[in-house]
């Protein structure tokens, strides 16, 4: 006979840590940096604080492959009595609300702790203080995987003399720095693109980054909302009914769902064949299933609210891409809110051109979900499909070209293609919005390139004519006895009038993409 037993949730995740991105020492180190950075960003920008984040990786034992990771932020901090559960209890989080978060399950920090203690048997060190707190709390914590509860190895309190607020975390883990280094660098730089209001300082064994704050403008913070009628399942509905005893169906719909007023609720119940005055607790199991089916089918609901979401915004995308990619020009678009299955989402796209972007046979793609850079599984992402199928020739782009594409999806529920959460699935509504966003951004690029072509034509015409100015001025000077320099200056002015732009204006707009050498332009320019 088989012996049956229940596996505690913390132990299950410890055994299946690859589901949270902790596949091996390389991915684990990258994932640790990612989890700590994203928690720091959520603890700052969501509360109107400009993020300042310090990160450090040290080699602790080269023979064992042990490294330490330290992260510190200036966020709102964690109340002292909550620190043990936040770091030591799986599925304990402040993120179980209907609004946009970087994290989804409240699992990331706990997976860092589980991986750390599984590979080094060392606790996580946490120090935190909330806004205006008189005390700083410090803990050393491990997780009891059998009871899914924190093990507090040490607890201390310090007076907060300088009114510091934020959270500092230090963990020891098995990690491959050399293999993870490039991914970590890419991740932090891509984070700086979509969050140019953050200052991120990173120090590794042989890598230092100082990603400066480029703007003080923060994106709007997402608001917490009620579920949309199309987004619930039977179990969710049953839980909501248990908390709504005594309500009629009409009252239940109005109080528990987003954008459902009395008129909308009455129209739906009449269409679905339900008595609006029936007690919601009196619904039979069959009626519950019918109610959910009808809620999904009904087309009279309003769209989900967009203030649950926090897109980066075209301005911040342009600032970030120019700063980090060194692009000559960036054109960004934020689409209007749409929904899939009752879940609101917004797609943003940006195209970056020229500058320090190297020419390639296809666009460099930078993918984001809820402001999180996605670095793995690019081939499985619907964004890669959209970019590859896009007809770039219609927008004056000829490959190889110095082109980068940024696609960001923000939603209360990102439809990931796999448990690794590194690629967005092919949801028709999201794919359509990606295509439209990319088209809108590419139209702006086409206008820009068309103008550059015309300016290049004029610059080449100027250079062709200007090559003869010195000789003509010399000959005219011999005939008229007028100074050659004065004649040359007048001839250059005549050419500029004919073209309609000064040489300084032409060079400013076109030199960076011109096939004409800088020496040619300098030679043809009046000194």
From Swiss-Prot:
A Pfam family this chain is assigned to: HATPase_c
Name of the featured protein: Type 2 DNA topoisomerase 6 subunit B
Sequence similarity: Belongs to the TOP6B family.
Record-listed ATP binding positions: 39, 73, 94-95, 103-110, 421
GO biological process: DNA topological change
Matching Gene3D superfamilies: 1.10.8.50, 3.30.230.10, Histidine kinase-like ATPase, C-terminal domain (3.30.565.10)
Any one Gene Ontology molecular-function term assigned to this protein's record: DNA topoisomerase type II (double strand cut, ATP-hydrolyzing) activity
Self-association and partners: Homodimer. Heterotetramer of two Top6A and two Top6B chains.
EC number: 5.6.2.2
Keywords: ATP-binding, DNA-binding, Isomerase, Nucleotide-binding, Topoisomerase
Family annotation (InterPro entries): HATPase_C_sf, Ribosomal_Su5_D2-typ_SF, Ribosomal_uS13-like_H2TH, Ribsml_uS5_D2-typ_fold_subgr, TopoVI_B, TopoVI_B_transducer
Described function: Relaxes both positive and negative superturns and exhibits a strong decatenase activity.
The species this protein was found in: Pyrobaculum aerophilum (strain ATCC 51768 / DSM 7523 / JCM 9630 / CIP 104966 / NBRC 100827 / IM2)
Catalytic activity as recorded in UniProt: ATP-dependent breakage, passage and rejoining of double-stranded DNA
Extent of the signal sequence: none
Record GO cellular component, one term: cytosol
